[in-house]
């Protein structure tokens, strides 16, 4: 037996450690490999480059409202294919696919609860549901949120993330722009605050209606906000747009929004603003609140 064969016979192959799928993810901006649970604890914000990734509607509302205070509103409302609409795919099939993918009935989730003990109603878009498009159920749930805020005499907060009106519902989708705007007029008459938080992206009919009607319009960093997208505008005007066009930093320079707030600071900032507007005591930033329990980071990172 040669010396090479003797060495080979003494080598015991090790089993390759298997890492469950979904434990690791990659930042869309800087490409950093991130531990999924740690990223969730950081509210989907990259710890390396501060890129704000998209967040599910439920995670956003659970990260905002006090634990144990959340009550969902309008969950019984479901979309219907009244027009029997079909493009490359039947609308009812698109709905079924989106509902299966997101485990949501439609693109807006509404909850009431407390924020540092203060009663509020909050709504958040689920962008993964058909691009967060606004149909009749989104409009109805938003109006339900307004009605609940009026009933409870409390503020309303809405986190927008939408591509605009849902084309599969045609005019019924477009009329939600007027319906939601009219509902907000009642908030104004009552003197109750409505804060609109613009996240990436907020476009089309949503940006042209309730998303820009806040008493205070707050944006997350680098959020794309506008009506038509930059590519469409460039093709229409046949000119190159300036860097950062339609991003929140560009809009605040032009006075289109009121402030930019990082996601980890959003909860306390909203509570502080609303406490002042409602003439209530300032929130205590040291108030205890159970966070997400994060399991230990695995020893091995995924192979590149």
UniProtKB/Swiss-Prot annotation:
This enzyme catalyses: N(6)-carboxybiotinyl-L-lysyl-[protein] + acetyl-CoA = N(6)-biotinyl-L-lysyl-[protein] + malonyl-CoA
The protein's location, in the record's own words, is: Cytoplasm
Question: Compositional bias of type Pro residues: which residue ranges?
Answer: 295-304
Which biological process terms from the Gene Ontology are attached to this UniProt entry? fatty acid biosynthetic process; malonyl-CoA biosynthetic process
**Cofactors (names):** Zn(2+)
Which UniProt keyword terms apply here? Answer: ATP-binding, Cytoplasm, Fatty acid biosynthesis, Fatty acid metabolism, Lipid biosynthesis, Lipid metabolism, Metal-binding, Nucleotide-binding, Transferase, Zinc, Zinc-finger
Domain of life, source organism: Bacteria
Q: Where is the CoA carboxyltransferase N-terminal domain?
A: 23-292
Q: Where is this region: Disordered?
A: 285-304
What is one cellular component GO term in this UniProt entry? acetate CoA-transferase complex
Give the enzyme's EC designation: 2.1.3.15
Q: Chief localization class?
A: cytoplasm
How does the cofactor attach, per the note? Answer: Binds 1 zinc ion per subunit.
Summarizing the function annotation, the protein's role is: Component of the acetyl coenzyme A carboxylase (ACC) complex. Biotin carboxylase (BC) catalyzes the carboxylation of biotin on its carrier protein (BCCP) and then the CO(2) group is transferred by the transcarboxylase to acetyl-CoA to form malonyl-CoA.
- Which PANTHER family does this chain map to? ACETYL-COENZYME A CARBOXYLASE CARBOXYL TRANSFERASE SUBUNIT BETA, CHLOROPLASTIC
The record's section on HAMAP family has: AcetylCoA_CT_beta (MF_01395)
Q: What is the protein's quaternary organization?
A: Acetyl-CoA carboxylase is a heterohexamer composed of biotin carboxyl carrier protein (AccB), biotin carboxylase (AccC) and two subunits each of ACCase subunit alpha (AccA) and ACCase subunit beta (AccD).
What family does the database annotate? Belongs to the AccD/PCCB family.
What NCBIfam families does the record tag this protein with?
A: accD
**This protein is called what?**
Acetyl-coenzyme A carboxylase carboxyl transferase subunit beta
**Taxonomic source organism:** Escherichia coli O6:H1 (strain CFT073 / ATCC 700928 / UPEC)
């Amino acid at each position: 037996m040669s010396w090479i064969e003797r060495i080979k016979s003494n080598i015991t192959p090790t089993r390759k450690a298997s890492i469950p799928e979904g434990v690791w993810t990659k930042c869309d901006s800087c490409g950093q490999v991130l531990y999924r649970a740690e990223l969730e604890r950081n509210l989907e914000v990259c710890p390396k480059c501060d890129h704000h990734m998209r967040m599910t509607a439920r995670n956003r509302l659970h990260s905002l409202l006090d634990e144990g205070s959340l009550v969902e509103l309008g969950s019984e409302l479901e979309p219907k294919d009244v027009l029997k609409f079909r493009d490359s795919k039947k609308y009812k099939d698109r709905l079924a696919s989106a509902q299966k993918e997101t485990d949501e009935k439609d693109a807006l989730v509404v909850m009431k609860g407390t924020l540092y003990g203060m009663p509020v109603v909050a709504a958040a878009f689920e962008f993964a549901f058909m691009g967060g498009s606004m149909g009749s159920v989104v409009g109805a749930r938003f109006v339900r949120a307004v009605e609940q805020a009026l009933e409870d005499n409390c503020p309303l907060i809405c986190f927008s993330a939408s591509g605009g009106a849902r084309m599969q519902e045609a005019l019924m989708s477009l009329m939600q722009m007027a319906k939601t705007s009219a509902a907000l007029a009642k908030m104004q008459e009552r003197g109750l605050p409505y804060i609109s938080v613009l996240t990436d992206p907020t476009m089309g009919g949503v940006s042209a209606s309730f998303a820009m009607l806040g008493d205070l319009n707050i944006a997350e960093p680098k959020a794309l906000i506008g009506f038509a997208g930059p590519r469409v505008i460039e093709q229409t005007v046949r000119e190159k747009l300036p860097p950062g066009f339609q991003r929140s930093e560009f809009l605040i320079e032009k006075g289109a929004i009121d402030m930019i707030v990082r996601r980890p600071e959003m909860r306390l900032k909203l509570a502080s603003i609303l406490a002042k507007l409602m003439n209530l005591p300032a929130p205590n930033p040291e108030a205890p609140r159970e966070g997400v329990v994060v399991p230990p980071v695995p020893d091995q990172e995924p192979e590149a």
